């Protein structure tokens, strides 16, 4: 899974951490996750007409896992995946492409095309919806009076200013015909079962892919505050329209894989004294790197011996430069920058989708034995990838076909 393993596995501790990352990505594969979930929960697909749609970075692998359970009664299947993702072919499956991390015309045309196969649905039909990270940009149809460039530019402006996923998706649902529960109105009166891989804090169904099947009750005050914070007085954004309960009565949603599952698997396989710090970390990478230092120092002052640690979540970066990098690579460099001579550590941070920001890497790994020069210079232009790749620190996996946000794993102690 890690393509440049030999280049970056330059210490025993690095090898151990990289081996665990590799093993975890394989074990947490979406194809296995959905198979195991269906069998464990004895889920039955009792309909003579089954329709399937899916969107997200894990859509193809999720389809591969559910396929044996539904193929006999399947009348239509179509998914939207990133435009650069490699997939195999199934005769019955229509694979469409979209753009990520910013939506675009390709995502819109694919979304319209995918939904065109869901005609004349009735209460005896079953629609299966496969949702995973990246779905917000891959699955999109703008509201009336909004065009795709509006959505793209608003999203980019908010992301560049360091918004979190909750704020971004709150605004996205205002601009879209399919987000914020609006997809549920299109699938009514059919029964709907959705299988979801969560890439957000607290596994909030209203946030994953901007909640296409979930009623979202935003407080007007929160929405207006978010719009003003990042966009000023932008009159393109309409108020959320209320959706009647009847459209959600036949919708069942199951989260089959989440960040916490990754952390639990890592914890069970570390085979050493370890601390699982949980999966709800968020905020700016600059702040989180300092917070993490303080947490680890406090743990060490209690343990008085080396320990492995792991945590998950999703951070943000204030983009000011035009370099190649991402939040995970910036985090490990900032951790190194803020460390003292008494601290001994190895730390890796990676995106489980295999893509970190605007770079070819999934994330980065650094340690206290291998000093890196000119960190500030590269951070100032958001060019973490080019610094790490020449210092044996960029983790390259390619697209994994998964996405449960980010994972941080490391070893820490003080001299």
From Swiss-Prot:
Activity's dependence on pH: Optimum pH is 7.3 and 50% of activity at pH 5.6 and at pH 8.6.
Documented EC number(s): 2.7.1.165
Pfam families according to UniProt: DUF4147, MOFRL
Cofactor(s) annotated in UniProt: Mg(2+); Ni(2+); Mn(2+); Co(2+)
Enzyme class: transferase
GO CC term (a single one): cytoplasm
SUPFAM superfamilies named in the record: GckA/TtuD-like
Protein residues bound to substrate: 57
Reported temperature dependence: Optimum temperature is 60 degrees Celsius. It does not lose activity upon incubation at 60 degrees Celsius for 2 h. The half time at 70 degrees Celsius is about 5 minutes.
Annotated Gene3D superfamilies: Glycerate kinase, MOFRL-like N-terminal domain, MOFRL domain
Catalytic activity: (R)-glycerate + ATP = (2R)-2-phosphoglycerate + ADP + H(+)
Cofactor: binding details: Magnesium. It could be replaced to some extent by nickel, manganese or cobalt.
Gene Ontology molecular-function annotations: ATP binding; glycerate 2-kinase activity; glycerate kinase activity
Family statement: Belongs to the glycerate kinase type-1 family.
Subunit record text: Homodimer.
PANTHER family registered for this protein in UniProt: GLYCERATE KINASE
Protein name as annotated: Glycerate 2-kinase
Organism: Picrophilus torridus (strain ATCC 700027 / DSM 9790 / JCM 10055 / NBRC 100828 / KAW 2/3)
